[in-house]
Amino acid sequence: MTTQQETLTDGNALKQFVVLAKSSKGRAIVSIIEKALNHPSVFVFGELLDMPNVQQLKETEFKNYYDLLLIFAYGSFIDYKNKKDSLPQLTPQMITKLKQLTIVFLSSTSNVIPYSVLQEQIEITNVRELEDLIIDSIYQNIIKGKLDQKNKHLEIDFSIGRDVQPEQLDSMINCLNNWSSTSQKLLDDISGLITHSDKVHLQYRKEKEEFESKFEIAKLNTKNDSPAEQLYYDSMEYSDEVRMKKGPKIKGKDYNKRP
C-alpha cells in the first residue's frame, strides 16, 4: 500500500500539500506545514499559504506556524532569528532550507555576493561550511553559479523564483511595462534598419540595371562608330572581364596568383 509520504514526489509535492490542506484544520494543518517546510523539494509556499484553512491559523493558537510559513515564503534567515522567540523551533532540514532561500533572496539584489555578506545573513562563520552549503544548493538546482575562492565571493548565474508578496505586484508590473517599452523601441529600431537596408539594396539594383542597360545600348551603337571608337568600347569590356578573373588586389598583391 502506498503511504502518504511516498506520494509526495518531487513533481507533485506542493500540489499534494495544497490538496491535503483543503480538508484539514487546526493541528492537521500545522502538520502539513511542518511536512512542507521539511520536504527537500519544496521551495515555494505561496499556494499553500493562500489556502483558506491555512489563513484561518492567524486567528488560532497556531498563528506562530502561519508566521513561520510566511517567513519561508517571503523572508530570510535573519527574519526568523529576529522573531525566534515567538516562532516554532526549526528542524535541521528547515534551517538548511531557510539558509538556501536566503541565498536566493540575496541573489535577487546582486549577482555577486561576498562571502562576508553570506556569512552575516545566514550566520555561518566557517568558510568551508558556507561553501558546502552553496555547493549543495547548486547540486539541487536552487542556484547556478560558481565560487570565487580567491576573491571570496559567489557569482550567481541563475536562482529559482520565490513567492511574490501582494504589495510587490505593482513594482513588478512597472518593471515589466518598462521592459516591454524598451523591447518595443529596440524592435522599432531594428525594423528601421531593415527597411533602410532594403531601400539601399533596391537602389543599388536599380543603378546596376540602369548601368548595364546603358552599357548594352552603347555597345550596340558602336556598330555605327568609327573603328577607333569601337576598339575603345571593346577594350573597356575586356578590361572588366580581366578584373573579374583576377579578383581584387590589395597593396599590389594578387590574391588569385598561386605562390
From Swiss-Prot:
It comes from Dictyostelium discoideum. Belongs to the CSN7/EIF3M family. CSN7 subfamily. Component of the CSN complex. The holocomplex is comprised of 8 subunits csn1-8. In the complex, it probably interacts directly with csn2, csn5, csn6 and csn8. This is COP9 signalosome complex subunit 7. InterPro entries: COPS7/eIF3m, PCI_dom. Transmembrane segments: none annotated. Keywords: Cytoplasm, Nucleus, Signalosome. GO terms for cellular component: COP9 signalosome; cytoplasm. Residues 1-161 form the PCI domain. It comes from the Eukaryota. It is found in: Cytoplasm; Nucleus. Component of the COP9 signalosome complex (CSN), a complex involved in various cellular and developmental processes. The CSN complex is an essential regulator of the ubiquitin (Ubl) conjugation pathway by mediating the deneddylation of the cullin subunits of E3 ligase complexes, leading to modify the Ubl ligase activity. The gene is csn7.
